[in-house]
Regions:
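Sec-dependent bacterial lipoprotein signal peptides
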Residues: 1-25
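Structural signature of multi-pass, alpha-helical inner-membrane proteins
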Residues: 2-6, 27-178
Length: 178
C-alpha cells in the first residue's frame, strides 16, 4: 500500500512538471513576442561557372536583375544598430556597423567602386519571408561604417524591420558578452 502512495506522489510530480510549460505559456499569451529580423548585405559580382554567384531581382515596381556573390559580406552580427531616417522625398535606412563590419564595408566599397551592395532583409512573424530591399550604388569608399539606402518597402515595414534587426543585434551582442 505504501508503494502505491509513493508511486502516486511521483506520478503527481511528473504530471505537474509535464503541465508546467503549458501553464507558463498560457500566462504569457498576453505578452507581445519580441520581433526579430535578419540582414544580409551582398556584393555585386560577375557570373561565374563555379557557382559562387547568382542573379537576384531587386525592386518590385521595376525589377532589376543584379548578379551577386552568394555569401553575404555583412549580416546582423556585424551591426551596432539600425534606424529609419528622414530623407529627401521620404525615408531611408541607416545601418551602423561594428568595428569588423566597418572594416569590411570600407574594404568592399574601396575595391568595388561603380558596383552595388545588394541588401536582403527578413522580418515579421514569419521571418522565412523576406525580400531584396535595395541595391545601393558604390560611388566612394565608405570608411565611417554607416550604410544608408532607400529600401523597397513601406514606412511601416521599415519600422518593423528596424525594430526586429535591433532586437536581433541586441540578442547577438548579449550572447557574446556571456
Amino acid at each position: 500500500m505504501r508503494t502505491m502512495k509513493v508511486l502516486a506522489r511521483y506520478f503527481n510530480i511528473y504530471l505537474a512538471l509535464a503541465l508546467l510549460p503549458g501553464l507558463v505559456a498560457s500566462c504569457e499569451t498576453g505578452k507581445k513576442k519580441a520581433q526579430t529580423a535578419a540582414l544580409r548585405v551582398h556584393i555585386e559580382a560577375l557570373p561565374d561557372a563555379a557557382g559562387t554567384s547568382q542573379p537576384v531581382s531587386v525592386l518590385r515596381s521595376e525589377p532589376v536583375l543584379v548578379n551577386i556573390k552568394k555569401e553575404p559580406i555583412l549580416t546582423e552580427a556585424n551591426l551596432i544598430n539600425a534606424k529609419v531616417i528622414e530623407a529627401r522625398g521620404g525615408f531611408a535606412l541607416e545601418l551602423r556597423f561594428d568595428e569588423n563590419g566597418t572594416w569590411l564595408l570600407e574594404q568592399y566599397s574601396a575595391a568595388n567602386n561603380g558596383q552595388h551592395f545588394v541588401v536582403f532583409g527578413q522580418w515579421g512573424e514569419k521571418r522565412s519571408e523576406g525580400r531584396w530591399l535595395a541595391a545601393p550604388f558604390i560611388s566612394r569608399r565608405i570608411s565611417n561604417g554607416i550604410l544608408v539606402f532607400t529600401p523597397d518597402c513601406s514606412r511601416e515595414e521599415a519600422d518593423q524591420f528596424v525594430a526586429g534587426i535591433n532586437e536581433a543585434t541586441k540578442q547577438i551582442h548579449k550572447g557574446l558578452l556571456k
